[in-house]
């Protein structure tokens, strides 16, 4: 389901503070975040976030096409190893 328009996008408060501090300092360090549910805002464009996927922080460089999406969409939590092959065909 889509969030209702009158509520506006959800962004973690600490995430806004970290992004503002990074913009003010002008440094291009990776900002570590755990909030996969936060929406990417236009003010995040050009910053790099380390989005936690349960094991490590996956670096996500935000560009204009990502605005409006969630951080979790760009940090997969599961690894696909492929379907099991046919055992009879190998012999």
From Swiss-Prot:
Keyword Ribonucleoprotein among UniProt keywords: yes
GO molecular function ontology, one term from the record: rRNA binding
Pfam families membership: Ribosomal_S19
Gene Ontology process terms (BP): ribosomal small subunit assembly; translation
Coiled coil: none
UniProt keyword annotations, A-Z: Ribonucleoprotein, Ribosomal protein, RNA-binding, rRNA-binding
UniProt-listed InterPro entries: Ribosomal_uS19, Ribosomal_uS19_bac-type, Ribosomal_uS19_CS, Ribosomal_uS19_SF
GO cellular component: cytoplasm; small ribosomal subunit
Function: Protein S19 forms a complex with S13 that binds strongly to the 16S ribosomal RNA.
Entry's family note: Belongs to the universal ribosomal protein uS19 family.
NCBIfam families hit by this protein: rpsS_bact (TIGR01050)
Protein name per UniProt: Small ribosomal subunit protein uS19
Lineage, top ranks: Bacteria, Pseudomonadati, Pseudomonadota, Alphaproteobacteria, Hyphomicrobiales
